[in-house]
Each structure stands twice: as structure tokens, then as C-alpha cells.
Amino acid sequence: MKNVSAFLKRHSALLLLVLVLATVPAGIAFGKYVKSVKVTNEISIKVSVATSATNYTIDKTTLKEVLQDLQTPATALYFVKRSQVPVNAKQLETDIKADDNKSGSIFAYQIGNDIYIAPADNVDARLYAPVDSSYFLSINYSGDIISGDISRIKLLKTIKCDNLDTSRVENMSNMFYMGKSKASDTALTTLDVSKFNTANVTDMSYMFCGCDSLTSLDVSKFNTTNVTNMSYMFYDCRALTSLDLNFNTSKVTDMSSMFTDCIGLTSLNVSSFDTSSVKSMTDMFNACNSLTSLDVSNFNTSNVTTMQSMFDACKGLTTLNVSNFKTSNVTDMSSMFQDCWVLTSLNVSSFDTSKVTSMSYMFRKCTELTTLDVSNFNTSNVESMEGMFSACSLTSLDLSSFDTYKVTKMKYMFYNCSNLTTIKVSDKFTTGNVTNSTNSFYMFQGCEKLVGGKGTPYNSSETDKTYAWIDGKDNKRGYFTGDLTTNSVIGHSDAPGISFD
């Protein structure tokens, strides 16, 4: 017992230190934040304990300045724990921490062309992306987030975000924006965001816009429950061939240009999308020209106001089911199906077009369409029908429901419909408000097989609005077929007369 008592007396300070260390939580950083611990023999031992600096939030402006100022440009960027930084990596001087007086120091470490972003003083700490992570790593934008040229970000081939905690982020718009110009080819081929926590994010617009060299992108675990904006999200991701989108889109209001210029996509499953809140589908699938099929049959479009160019240049689509679309609130259908070259059938017979003001180029260059039922279209509010049916392979058109009193543009309306033989109209088809001759220029140009109801044949020198008339009505020539017994007032008591100079 005497030996034990003597041992305890001689080593009491050491034993107390062991007890103190045993009470410190695992993962606490040592060496920066210091607290004195007084022991019975008056020896003061300094032990590092955690304080408020357990929050390592990245300052996005400083991060981009560091990348831009590198003497050796980086081609790979890794967000890692301090323990994962290679031992021979050089620490750069700038502290990449948020200016909140609470965040611990975050440094960039470089070895060759690789950059590692990690906490400076805690081997196991996680890095936090800021609440507003818009333009986190981006180029070619304007605003007060950062000034100057940051073009070196274009040289990055790899970005891996294993230790980037995004649980606090609310805004991811433009997060990896690489520009919308097709000439701005970026080097980025690998972007690992598979571990992103997106539960609090409301905006993902332009998130991957212009990442034109990405061949794959794993967003399958994204929680999009609170996202309201997905516009331009994958715009110009030209090298992607597929996307696994297990998205909850119930709150999304804007899907405009979401997949525009994803020219490499060969498959895209959006069949489970809840689009009940969406208002804009402008350019949504524009130029997805490698898709051969696209299931949008379950889309709820009751709140959509614009479908402009929605399927424009989907040159590989052979079938497209839009028969369930609710379009009562849509005002713009211009170029909606333009350049759908290989569509052989299209059912738009149930479309409610009562609020539509523009149908310009709506079916332009649907070159495989031989039939199209638009006999129920309500066009009473349409102002432009420019190029509406141009370059289609239709043999006949029933436009008997068309009220064109408000239409001011009919240029190229039937341009190069070389197989068209018959156009049926009622007396509500008027050109009275197409007052500028250029607005009916080449209206019937190239309709070589077209014949009016009383036998008036197509004449290549007679192709403007003058011949948008029921053939034989009031003893005048025209290319339309219709009832000759109705009033020539053309359906409106205040309709202007049609000049046949």
C-alpha cells in the first residue's frame, strides 16, 4: 500500500491529465484553442479543447480568388478532411473561411495540378457550403459576388465534393455554371455531387448550366422536396447520355430550358414528375435531338402558361403523347413542335387554345406529319400564325374553327407545304388585320399541289394574303375551300374588308 500511495503522490498530475483527456469528446481539434487546467501540485498543463470554431464554412468569393491566383493552374479540386490531404501538399496562404468570426480556418493545399480544400486545424471536421451557394464555382457571369476574370475555373477537369456539407444550403442556382455559349467548351468531365444534402434547397436553376463535357452526373439521391426553380438546370450538358432523376417536383414552378441542348441524351425518364405547380415549360426539351422517345403523358399542365419551343428540335422523337395536356392557361405555343422531323403522328385535338396569343412556327418542319387535327382549335385570341404549318407534309388542313380576326402575322404560314391540296376554312378566317404586306409574305409559297374549292390552282406569283380567300366566294379567286353561301363580312360585323388589288 505504501508503494501505491507513493506512486499516486509522485504521478498525480499525470493521472489528472489522463482524466481530463478522457473527458474531451472524440474529434476535437488540439493546438489552437487553449484552456488552462490547474492540478494539485501547481503544475499548469495546457489542453486544447473545442470552442465555437467547429463550423468550417467556405467563403465562395475567396475560394475562386485562390483558384484564379494559382501559379500552376489546377485541373482537379477536392473538398476533403484535413487527414486526407497528401503529406507533401503545399499549404497556400489565403484563409478560405466565411467572414463570420466563428468559422475555423480553411486552407487550400496544392500538389501539382491538384488542389485540396480542407480545415486547417481539425483532421475530421466537415466543410460547410454557405447557405447561399449560388455561383459557388462558376464562370462568365456578372454581379457583385466576385469581380475580375475567373476563366481558370474552365481548366478544372475534376471536382469532388466528398467532404462538402450542403445541409445548410438553400440556394444552389448557378452553383457550377460554366456559361451558355456553345463555344465556351469547358474541361470539366467529372463532377461528384452524389453526397449532396439538398433537403433545404429551394433554387437549382442553372446549377449545371454549360457543363458541356460532363459524361455522367449522379443526382439520383437529390432531395428536391423544397425546390421551386429548376430552369436551365442541365442546360447545354451536351455530353450527358442519361440522367437518373428521382426528383420530387411538386413545388417546382419553373422548368423552362431545364434540358435545353442536352443533345447527347438518349434516354430521359421524367414520367414521375409532378408538374402540377409548373407555370413555365418554355424550351424544356429544346434540342434534345438524340431522344427517340419521351414519356410526358402524365404531366399535369393545368397551371402552365407558356409552352413556347417546349419540344423544339427534338429531331429524333418518333412518338409523343400530349393528348392529356391541359392547356387552358397557356398563352404561348409558338415553335412548340418545330423541327420534330420524324414525328409521324401528333394528337393535339383536345388542346384548349382559348388563351393562346402566339402559334407562330408551332408545327414548322414536322416533315413526317401527314395528318394533323386542329379542327377544334379556338384561335380567337391568336395574334401571330407566322410559319405555323410551314414545311409540313400534310395533304389537307381543316381550319374551319379558326377565327383569325386578331391575327396580324401570317407570313410563311403554309410555306413549302408541297403536299397540301386542300385548306378548309369558314368565313371567320380573315386577313383584315394583316395590314403590312410583309406580314403575309410567302404565305402560300411552295404549295404546288394546292387547289381552291372552285378549282383555282396554285400560282407561284400569287402567294400572299390576297389568296387567303374561299375560292369562288363573291366571284373571287382564292386557295381556300369553304361555304359560299355565308356572309362575306367574315364573321365579324366590324371586320375590315379584304383588298384584292
Label each region the model flagged.
Residues 35-39, 44-149, 157, 161-165, ...:
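N-terminal capping/linker segments that flank leucine-rich repeat
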Residues 112-128, 139-170, 181-202, 212-228, ...:
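Structural signature of tandem-repeat unit edges
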